[in-house]
């Protein structure tokens, strides 16, 4: 997405980008297609800045000496035939979801999982030498018969740590942070905390585990609370409906719930490459789903250009989606409550 933002910084709707990234020990590989001007030096600088900002300065992956292989090349003329007139960049189906479980209309489990790792990052960047930049979490909620979250049953958190840190100290340190994040009324004496279950976690990030664009699409979205069409978001310009239509469906779902028309809503849409209008559209909710579907179809321009124009998507805003999910951040345009 940092490479995409380089392209989007020109704010030219004729530009295109589909950038894939592979990261492993001391190596970053970029591949994909773009339309526009990308200088190798600015791409190199953008990649190193991302790595530095995350905090990777370890022997096996350091922003200053990582080897960058840039295999980006021009967009296919065949694909351009469809997208230059703002037809969909590919076929596919996309889903959006919202629930009134949390203040930002996200499911409880993914919401609190994001808050945990967000706080770990904050503690680390405020000067803690215990934690490393690689971390992830998972929260298991129990629901009552009315589908309301009532307690947290289990919390899993794995975080990279200093090689000299005692594992029990790390576990206690991290558990204290987690308990400060989670609402007390969800946590009880039976709540289980599984922190670094395998024990030592010193070698982390791309040095310990190869990473590839699109390998974590559920943590990018709703944590499994909603179906997923399978298309990843990052690196894709907004003519790719994998991304832009997923943002549209989130906006629709959020506005339905925020307006009180339902307690939860799942929105599905699909497209064919080169075609402007959706192939299908439906809403499932605990409200009047049939009427909601008709109402939204009449109110919303669901063509790729309509989506792009509504959210002003030809802007360099995509790096801000790369951690803590693509949804639930009020400053992003598809999170606005302004449909009804």
Question: Where are the regions a protein language model picked out?
Answer:
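N-terminal, positively charged regions that mediate nucleic acid binding
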Residues: 1-16, 23
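Short amphipathic alpha-helical face segments that pack within enzyme cores
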Residues: 2, 111, 115, 244-251
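Secondary-structure transition/capping motifs at alpha-helix termini
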Residues: 9-11, 257-263
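Short, charge-patterned binding micro-sites
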Residues: 16-37, 273-277
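Glycine-rich, mobile lid/loop segments that gate access to catalytic sites or pores
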Residues: 17, 25-27, 45, 49-202, ...
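Short glycine-rich or small-residue beta-strand-to-loop segments that form or flank ligand, phosphate
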Residues: 27-35, 94, 98, 156-160, ...
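Glycine-rich anion/phosphate-binding loop at the beta-strand->alpha-helix junction
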Residues: 164-257
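Internal helix-turn-beta structural module
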Residues: 262-264, 268-340
């Amino acid at each position: 997405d940092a490479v995409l933002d380089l392209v989007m910084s020109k704010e030219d709707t004729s530009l295109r980008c589909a950038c894939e990234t592979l990261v492993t020990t001391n190596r970053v590989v970029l591949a994909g297609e773009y339309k526009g001007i990308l200088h190798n030096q600015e791409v190199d600088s953008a990649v190193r800045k991302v790595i530095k900002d995350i905090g990777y300065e370890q022997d096996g992956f350091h922003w200053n000496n990582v080897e960058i292989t840039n295999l980006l090349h021009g967009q296919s003329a065949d694909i351009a035939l469809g997208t230059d007139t703002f037809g969909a960049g590919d076929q596919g189906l996309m889903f959006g979801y919202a629930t009134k479980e949390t203040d930002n209309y996200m499911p409880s489990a993914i919401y609190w999982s994001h808050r945990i790792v967000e706080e770990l990052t904050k503690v680390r960047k405020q000067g803690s030498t215990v934690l490393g930049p690689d971390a992830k979490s998972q929260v298991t909620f129990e629901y009552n018969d009315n589908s309301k979250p009532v307690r947290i049953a289990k919390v899993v958190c794995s975080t990279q740590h200093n090689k000299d840190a005692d594992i029990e100290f790390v576990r206690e340190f991290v558990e204290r942070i987690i308990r400060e994040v989670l609402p007390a009324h969800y946590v009880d004496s039976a709540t289980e905390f599984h922190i670094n279950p395998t024990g030592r976690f010193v070698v982390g990030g791309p040095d310990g585990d190869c990473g590839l664009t699109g390998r974590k699409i559920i943590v990018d979205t709703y944590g499994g609370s909603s179906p997923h069409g399978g298309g990843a978001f990052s690196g894709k310009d907004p003519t790719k409906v994998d991304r832009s239509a997923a943002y549209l469906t989130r906006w629709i779902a959020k506005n339905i719930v925020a307006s009180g028309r339902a307690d939860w809503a799942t929105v599905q849409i699909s497209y064919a490459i080169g075609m402007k209008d959706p192939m299908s559209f439906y809403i499932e909710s605990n409200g009047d789903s049939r009427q909601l579907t008709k109402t939204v179809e009449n109110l919303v321009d669901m063509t790729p250009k309509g989506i792009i124009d509504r959210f002003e998507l030809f802007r360099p805003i995509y790096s801000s989606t790369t951690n803590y999910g693509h949804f639930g951040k009020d400053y992003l345009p598809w999170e606005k409550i302004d449909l009804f």
